């Protein structure tokens, strides 16, 4: 089922929570609403579900306007951060619950319900826990059961509100891979709310980056990461360091270093900020003009990566090198490091000037 959102607005008193939201979610895609707390992503999810009313605009499911329809009529499945499993019911009954409360005319037979629940428990790989109760399960197992329960009623749309937020990092990573596989197998149109950039980049077919009630950028995970359209998206999608430079004659200049801008973009001479991610630095060769010369303050090796903190012009700059690259150079605290970037994202007044191709 496709989702179309047209000119959606929502106020809470004087607070404008959603500002003219327009969005298309293609059939069968997993789309993440990504943004910081208070950006409007959960409010948008609740309006799509029918749990909240918009002040203006329309929501269409497969081209049919459902803006005024009750949540029960929208055939939506929910998975929340805190599971919402019934403590007094075992796993089997929790998964079956949505089917048992359907109107009599729509309710499957007991045999059909049993077959459906067994199928879903097999899908989430928890058939052996059918008789267990929620308090006997781990957090990851509870969330799998919550998803199985949401899928039991065969929703046309699956909505997930920070489903892994309460779990530890290792379990979150495991469940992200699992969710991606489940979605690939079922093909249910799904919308995931998250503030976790890594989660969105890993599981999504498309990402919608939100801030202050507006959509900043929509695109594939690769496009959002490789071609950010403004400074907010660049900074929100991972650690960056910012450098104030100037655009002149098709180059962004900083500290004697020049970064050539793409000729297809219009530019004018102006001040502009260059953003560089930690892993997009490299140590300058003898013949290269470095962008910065900085003293190493801290070195921290983590597995195959070496994280380096340097001080440049009273600014902390973060560098991440592959262990093999770090081993080729005499890196030590207190020594000077000459660096050039592999990529610079350049913006002027939050407007895109350059991105990687």
UniProtKB/Swiss-Prot annotation:
Annotated Pfam families: ABC_tran (PF00005), CysA_C_terminal (PF17850)
Annotated GO MF terms: ABC-type sulfate transporter activity; ABC-type thiosulfate transporter activity; ATP binding; ATP hydrolysis activity
Domain (ABC transporter) ranges: 3-237
Top-rank EC class of the record's enzyme: translocase
GO cellular component: ATP-binding cassette (ABC) transporter complex
Cellular compartment(s): Cell inner membrane
Protein name, entry field: Sulfate/thiosulfate import ATP-binding protein CysA
Organism this protein belongs to: Neisseria meningitidis serogroup B (strain ATCC BAA-335 / MC58)
